[in-house]
Amino acid sequence: MAFGITCYLCMSCVCLDATAAVDTAKPRGKNIHNKKQTSKSIPLNKPVIQNITKQEVYNFGDDPNIAAAISFTMKDDLASAVAAAERSGDPEFAKAAVEVLRIYNNPSKIALTKLEAFLKTHNWVPEEIFIPKIENSINYATNPDELVQWFDYKPPGTNRGKFFLLNANIRLRKADISKEEIRSKLRSLWRSTEFDSSTEEKIISEYKDVFTVDDLLKKIDFLIWNNNPAFAQKLATFLPSKYRPLATSKLEVAKHPERAYKYWGSNDEFIKYIYLRNLSKTKVDKNFIKSLESIQPKGNYEKWWKLKNIGFREALNNKDFQAAYNLTQHHGLEAGAAFADAEWYGGWIALEFLKNPDKAIAHFLPMYENTKLANSKSKAAYWLARAYFAAKNLEKATFWYKKASMYTSTFYGQLSLAESRGGVRYNYFDGNQELNKSLSTQADKDKTKKIVLLAYYLFKANYKMLAYNIIDHIPKLHLGRVDLEAAAFFFNKRDLRPLAVELGKSSANRSFILIKGAYPTNVRIVNSKLPKALYLAVIRQESNFDHLAFSSAGARGLMQLMPKTASVLASKLRLPKDAYAYDPNANILKGSTYLDQLYSQYGNMILTIAAYNAGPGNVQKWVKLFGDPRKMSVIQKINWIETIPFSETRNYVKKVLENMVIYDMMLVPSHNTRSIIKFLEL
């Protein structure tokens, strides 16, 4: 079937009468998971998950002794923890949970030989969560024989681990420090690794005859770039006099960034970076853009990309599209989120502003080939389809739209489905039938049961981030939908919806399978004026349905309300000012009322969602800078979303919209599901 993106290009939304909304910006912050809070009843009924048989449900009950064992471990009372574990219904599992928590909290207290023995005999434990912590705990005091044995079991994944392995082999005379190959490797690892001060001093003392002036210069540079000027200053005292002036200048700039302008002429990359970073906070103009264009970084690519991101956005605002494109080039990145970001923006600017689809394809294709997660895959595939469509290659456009449409939980996957199916009803939980089949063995399923139970007890003990990380391991076991639904059912049945939601998010993004249990619907919304799908989508994105969630910025509850916003709404709704923090019903009432007010003000779903995340003040600025999405076609609205300067808000708008589509299908199963296009038009 041909895809007809052009059929939407002239559409625009209908504006509603606007009334004033609460103009309270909502600063964001990282969720804080491990602080104790008083639990209140949540306004949710018991969930109903269809198509799950009794055999597929995890048949676990609460064991107070397992909970006690974890509690004692948190207090560092190992004897009591082991005693409680022995009293439990499953002593082997309970003792494993104790050990997992000990490794997570402080692996340096456990001998490497014991860590190896534990992981070998408990192969269900998601070791990739703990290996970096274990490596980071290794130091000069670690027994070199144990260290070498450990790295025989788990080869080092960090420069720190590689350095200490080489150091141990040198100490054990398994590596000859007199050989240039060993000396070169040691120097390279030291130059690119940060240690604590006492470790650095031991390294210098032991290997001072190995390190060269070039090593010192590169190590000083590394430390300065990584915000450790204190030890860099100590190292500078070892430099010959002719190298000290530049090192002194860089150290001064590191401590006093505002002085960077004095040393611009030194042509040093760090000084130029600091100068331009300072400028980005006060004066982003043509000179700033020109200066950035002239620099092709030799390292620290992610830091430079953040600056270039600011520069190309300003160039777009000035309609200097070529300069904007130039700033996306020579980024030096090879993988990861920043790489995907840089390649996508290069392709997007080439396609939408320079009208050069061939250049765009040259960016979107490597993005698709070098990313793994559904969000990035679907985004690259969708824009490849648009680029091929613009190049009048309908066959390849159709191919890439179909590729993108596999990722049914994502914004761009849903856009591709809308293009291919029009108004035809689509069950997003069907997805790719091949992906629904389990590729796992019985051993994988047995591992999953233990992982599910471990996450359950850790979450209840307020180790929420650790529980989420453990849940994120499950999709790697290649389970089918039935097995994933069973795990979600277990969490929902025990009122731990956040873990069911996290499992759903991870499954959708890593194994591309959507599960119904990850989309809770039975939340009481009182006096709602907008589709219930919106409120549920916001709750899912804000808190994972965790009514005790709070962020470092102070946002609280299911809808992550900020204190100022909640206080203003409390007066209007005649509720206590602090009720949003402890009463889930009040939190939902205030949050849904705020969304209603925002929609009443803007008459547009995109602006409403963006304002809920970033505040109405920012949204007003963006409308002035980038245009009014209420007067735009669908593709222009998509471009408007991608123009939002805050990455969190950009992603937030897309996430809420994609959640709305799924919820709309679940809440109104009797009629054709509204495609994401329809929600973009609201």
Task: Identify the function of each model-found stretch.
Residues 10, 15-101, 428-450, 460:
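N-terminal leader/linker segments that initiate helical-solenoid repeat arrays
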Residues 51-59, 82-93, 104-107, 116-126, ...:
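Solenoid-like repeat scaffolds
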Residues 65, 94, 99, 131-134, ...:
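TPR repeat positional signature
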Residues 68, 99-102, 134, 165-167, ...:
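Structural register within alpha-helical repeat arrays
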Residues 72, 138, 169-171, 223, ...:
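Residue at a conserved register position within TPR or TPR-like alpha-solenoid repeats
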Residues 75, 105, 141, 172-176, ...:
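Structural motif corresponding to the intra-repeat A-B loop/turn of tetratricopeptide repeats
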Residues 91-93, 100, 115-121, 294-304, ...:
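Catalytic glycan-binding domains that act on GlcNAc-containing polysaccharides
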